[in-house]
Amino acid sequence: MVVERHNDWFRAPVKRHTTASEFNIDNIAALPQVDIVYSHGNVQPTAVQALVASGAKAIIHAGTGNGSVADRMVKPLQEAQAKGVVIVRSSRVPYGFVLRNAEQPDDKYDWVVAHDMRPEKARILTMLALAQGADTKTLQRMFWEY
């Protein structure tokens, strides 16, 4: 709470951050290409295909509600994944969680859920994680912790 330009903290942050993180940007020479695809009514797979062709290492799918993926997008995302692209489900709505295996069978697809991170923050965490060689299991752990 801020009262007369003075911060009073009542709760410590639960998630890891800043100096408590496992990332050291001094050891990262370059960040991998990670892009965001925003879902909407009548979404087409062309954006996913173009991002894969341009060298994306991961795609953050910004779905509606609980990170929903339209039926017509499942196959293109799986095809991207078959080419080595990591798929992370996030939500474009401002509040709430993307629950693992609720809207999509994430375990079956080996997709990662961003949990409480919006697509833009999920992109940054994914870039840092992939720069360190994280696989999908490690990346999922990071989304639970950060």
Predicted regions and their residues:
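Accessory alpha-helical/coil subdomains and C-terminal extensions
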Residues: 1-67, 145-146
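C-terminal non-catalytic interaction/assembly regions of soluble proteins
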Residues: 50, 63-146
